[in-house]
Design a protein with these regions (language model features):
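Acidic/histidine-rich helix-loop elements
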Residues: 16-26
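Short acidic-hydrophobic, aromatic-tinged amphipathic segments that line or gate anion-handling sites
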Residues: 200-204
Length: 204
């Protein structure tokens, strides 16, 4: 049987309705993902979450954001809205990857495994990356062959995480009913790009 991993990308209150960068449908997607994990947990050899965990991300944050390269303050490390969505937190998933501490980071593969809520220094984050405490290392150690990606937002961090998994040689699926884009237009563009890179878009 193929070794499979499930990556739950950035399902945080900051990206759900009422959050700083709330996406319409975010809370509903969080609940659907939680139901899926409860029903299919045994199908996966490795499950992880990712989180935006911004400490001082430079010009990724802006008071006058363009919503392309710069954004309002969001995913601020140590705040309730940067925590996992309650529906996901209740699953007690073992592996958590924090990303974007000191720079923009859209892919879960840019993060480090951190199963606490530490506010690390720039040097500590760099040391963790250098030591290989990354999603790529974790998937390799688990002998994973296929990666399923779900979460928020399909048009941004889900897409970039899926593309990085594909570049690393994994068979990749994105469950389209377990993700939501920032907008319909950006979602369609993301799906076109993912399909062009041999990522399978399927219903869960």
């Amino acid at each position: 049987m193929t070794q499979q991993a499930l990556i739950v990308v950035d399902v945080q209150p900051t990206f759900c309705e009422g959050g700083e960068l709330g996406v319409d449908g975010g809370n509903a997607v969080a609940e659907r993902i939680a139901t899926f994990v409860k029903q299919h947990r045994a199908d996966y050899d490795y499950i992880a979450t990712t989180q935006d965990w911004h400490i001082e991300p430079g010009d990724h944050w802006s008071e006058q954001p363009d919503f392309v390269d710069t954004w309002p303050v969001h995913g601020k490390a140590g705040t309730p809205n940067a925590e996992l969505h309650p529906a996901i937190a209740a699953l007690n998933i073992a592996h958590h990857f924090k990303k974007g501490q000191y720079s923009a980071a859209y892919s879960g593969f840019e993060g480090i495994e951190d199963n606490s809520d530490r506010i690390q220094s720039r040097e500590q984050v760099a040391a963790e990356l250098e030591a290989g405490h990354t999603l790529a290392t974790a998937l390799a150690d688990a002998n994973v062959l296929r990666v399923d990606v779900v979460g928020i937002a399909e048009s941004h961090c889900v897409k970039e995480t899926a593309l990085d998994a594909q570049r690393l040689g994994y068979d990749v699926r994105v469950f389209t009913d377990l993700t939501v884009p920032v907008s319909a237009e950006l979602g369609q563009a993301a799906r076109t790009e993912m399909q062009a890179n041999d990522i399978e878009l399927v219903h869960s």
